[in-house]
Design a protein with these regions (language model features):
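Nucleotide/phosphate-binding catalytic cleft detector across ATP-hydrolyzing
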Residues: 1-55, 60-250, 270, 294-295, ...
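Glycine-rich phosphate-binding loop of actin/hexokinase-like ATP-binding domains
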Residues: 202, 248-288
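Catalytic P-loop NTP-binding/switch module of NTPases
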Residues: 283-299
Length: 322
């Protein structure tokens, strides 16, 4: 499932979609709880995956045919987003209606009903932090799953700065970046190796708890049971970056309508994620104001003639706008 949601050997943690503080919560236990919610959705046979953006809301209904790692897409639909700005919900009623309508349209396309949903979160002031821990390997000298769990549980989430209390933020993802065994660094999977001291470096992505709660509330209001929330930056990178790109190091920038999600990968792991509160809509506004076009005309011009790469052919001649 790692290529789809980031589960599997990464032991990635998702926060409780209904919220909750990070201070004393056990990351590994929360990961297990997340897996249980996904298994419940799998037993139902299908669920909705929602990309809740500032400009549009995209929905896909996927079906599990025995293997959770290989879901099948039954239907896809997208609608103009409402109630979302810069990647966060700012009008609950509008966002709930947009989600409800998009899911209903996708259900008609798929010919099925869904009752569970996984959603993305772009905003919420994402913050990358690191944590590390070292524990003694259990008797016998070979690293077991229990030793891995022990090391992960020994990691403590760094406290927030003085301007924010720890209770104001919640963990969205927590993922081991590398393992150390008796001073040997850069291990991908220590299980089965012999040693005395096992260490782990953990990347933790936290977001504002209120942003998480609002996503969960919007899903519940739309009669959907939330099974998880995923960072847009992380999900975009998993869908775009090849395995060797993730291993050797790569950045992924998801230029959205109202905000852009940025993620960095190294050695196959997410090592940094952030949000830039600028997106394609701001480019459209610049074109509109600079040339005196209305917004729709500027958006059309941007889509048809704009490019993220400066090409020689684009520097010559006039562009028709009529």
């Amino acid at each position: 499932m790692r290529d789809f949601l980031g589960f599997g050997e990464t032991l990635m943690d998702h926060a409780d979609p209904r919220g909750g503080s990070t201070g004393s919560r056990d990351l590994y236990a929360r990961h297990r709880a997340m897996r249980e919610r996904l298994r419940a959705a799998q037993r139902q046979g299908r669920m909705a995956v929602l990309d809740i953006g500032s400009f549009k809301i995209c929905c896909a209904i996927i079906e599990f045919d025995g293997d959770i790692a290989s879901p099948r897409v039954l239907g896809v639909a997208q609608l103009r987003s409402r109630g979302v700005r810069a990647g966060v919900i700012v009008d609950m009623a509008e966002a709930e209606q947009a989600i409800r309508q998009d899911v209903a349209q996708t259900e008609r396309a798929a010919g099925v009903r869904v009752y569970h949903a996984l959603a993305t979160l772009t905003g919420g002031f994402p913050r990358s932090q690191t944590a590390a821990a070292e524990v003694a390997v259990s008797e016998g000298g070979r690293v077991t799953e229990a030793d891995v769990v022990h090391a992960l549980r020994a990691c403590k989430i760094p406290s927030s700065g003085p301007a924010e209390t720890a209770e104001a933020r919640t963990t969205l993802h927590a993922q081991p970046v590398s393992w150390t065994l008796d001073g040997e660094h850069g291990l991908r999977d220590p299980k089965g190796l012999s040693g005395r001291r096992l260490g782990v470096d953990l990347h933790i992505l936290t977001v504002a708890e209120s942003a998480m709660r609002n996503v969960a509330t919007a899903l519940l209001s739309a009669d959907l049971e939330p099974v998880g929330v995923v960072s847009t930056a992380y999900a975009s990178a998993l869908s775009c970056l090849m395995g060797d790109e993730q291993d050797h190091g790569a950045a992924c920038i998801d230029l959205g309508g109202g905000a852009s999600a940025v993620s960095l990968f190294l050695r196959g792991r997410l090592v940094f994620a952030d949000l830039v509160r600028l997106g394609g809509e701001h480019v459209t506004l610049d074109v509109s104001r600079g040339f005196g076009f209305d917004f729709d005309a500027a958006e059309r011009l941007k889509i048809l003639e704009g490019s993220a790469i400066a090409l020689g052919s684009s520097m010559r001649g006039a562009i028709g706008v009529g």
